Amino acid sequence: MQEIATIAYLKIHTGKEDEFRAVARECRDAVRAKDKGTLQYDWFFDPDGTTCVVHERYADSDAMIEHMGNLGETLGRLLGMADLSLELYGAPSEEIMRAVEGMDVKVYGHFLGLRD
């Protein structure tokens, strides 16, 4: 299976910045405790703290599905405080594509890399 990478852009709703950061920590803690195939999960904020960018990498599509299931309600709370746009890199499974259906998602297929 092929690695899957994502870059999530989250525009945090006004007044929700502190709550967003608290729920982000819950997400990180759940990933540490539960995810088996998550290879990268790094959070970044712009200088004013209103936009968050999350870099994620998964061993394969199954690992990304596992991740989404492990976060469940916590991810739902986070997405209730921010507007999401997602870039998805690799060859995501049909299950992933169904899971992100209706979201603002752009998919990019792999072309070249150092390991090719």
Regions found by a protein language model. Name each.
Residues 44-48:
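Short beta-strand micro-motifs enriched in acidic
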Residues 11-22:
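Short, surface-exposed ligand-recognition loops at beta-strand->loop->(often short) alpha-helix junctions
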Residues 50-52:
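Hydrophobic residues embedded in beta-strands of well-ordered beta-sheets
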